């Protein structure tokens, strides 16, 4: 997949338009709409912005840039176009359509969600886009909102679910487990002394941190998936303060310091709490491991 930080000149494209910040099942429906009959020869592309206003309102990331690129590539996208918003912010909807989508990107098919807005002051909507496409003689697919629980799927709903620890609902709206691939950093090695060696990972400042607590998780190491127990929070029993992800990979004992490891959250098991002793903590961890093995079984294949 080619990635462009400026608007390139392309030929014969089918383009999905939108925010695509989490690439949830609603975003995926828009991307899949590019697969129209008689459009197989078009190069599939996604057009968004690297710094759109929607990204600047304190909305933490639910998928890293690298993960989004991987997902789009797996979906068959050949070009990801991410110019700075300021480069086109003063274009009217009609000018954006004619100068950018047609003039530079040679769009032959456009797809968007029903709530899509474009152009200066977000004056253009999906209805206008459909009309402009008809006038130009190119295809246009406006995808209805995908519903979950009678309400449209949205990144804000996913963030709310994760903030409440409801990773199962978040996974249904994402179309995949919520996961993060972060560098393993040095910790206090308390887990190793307890017989449950753990990996510590620090969340980036702009990444969403799920509700504090203990999760059944799946951790991937060198292409192998292991059941695991992940604590997200501040480890109150041992007096830690900075929030991080600490994971015991069940059945793996290798050294992962300095490596990037993916952890996927399967199910929330219990709130983070302070135990009266290290022995009580150790017993709780082993109890958590038994639950996690059962909860993650279907995700290890």
What are the roles of these predicted feature ranges?
Residues 1-8, 81:
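Short acidic-hydrophobic, aromatic-tinged amphipathic segments that line or gate anion-handling sites
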Residues 9-12, 87-90, 147-151:
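A short acidic, often aromatic-flanked loop/helix-cap motif at beta-alpha or helix-coil junctions
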Residues 53-136:
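N-terminal Rossmann-like or analogous alpha/beta NTP/dinucleotide-binding catalytic cores
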Residues 133-231:
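Glycine-rich, Lys/Arg-enriched anion-binding loops that position phosphate/diphosphate groups
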């Amino acid at each position: 997949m080619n990635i462009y930080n400026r608007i390139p000149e392309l030929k014969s494209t089918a383009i999905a338009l939108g925010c695509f910040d989490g690439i949830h099942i609603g975003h995926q429906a828009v991307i899949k709409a590019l697969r129209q009959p008689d459009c197989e020869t078009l190069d599939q592309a996604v057009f968004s912005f690297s710094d759109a206003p929607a990204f600047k309102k304190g909305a933490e990331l639910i998928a890293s840039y690298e993960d989004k690129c991987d997902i789009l590539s797996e979906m068959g996208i050949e070009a990801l176009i991410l110019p700075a918003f300021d480069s086109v912010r003063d274009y009217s909807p009609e000018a954006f359509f004619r100068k950018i989508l047609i003039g530079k990107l040679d769009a032959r098919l456009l797809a968007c969600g029903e709530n899509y807005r474009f152009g200066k002051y977000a004056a253009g909507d999906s209805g206008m886009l459909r009309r402009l496409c008809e006038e130009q003689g190119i295809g246009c697919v406006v995808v209805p909102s995908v519903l979950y629980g009678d309400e449209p799927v949205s990144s804000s709903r996913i963030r709310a679910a994760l903030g409440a620890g409801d990773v199962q609902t978040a996974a249904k709206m994402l179309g995949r487990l919520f996961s993060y691939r972060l560098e393993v950093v040095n910790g206090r090695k308390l887990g190793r002394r307890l017989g449950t060696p753990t990996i510590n990972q620090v969340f980036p400042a702009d990444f969403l941190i799920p509700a504090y607590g203990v999760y059944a998780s799946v951790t991937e190491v060198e292409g192998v998936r292991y059941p695991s127990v992940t604590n997200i929070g501040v480890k109150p029993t041992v007096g830690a303060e900075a929030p991080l992800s600490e994971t015991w990979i069940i059945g793996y004992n290798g050294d992962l310091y300095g490596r990037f490891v993916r952890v996927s959250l399967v199910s929330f098991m219990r709130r983070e709490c302070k135990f009266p002793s290290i022995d009580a903590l150790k017993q709780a961890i082993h109890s958590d491991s038994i639950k996690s093995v059962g909860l993650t079984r279907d995700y290890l294949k």
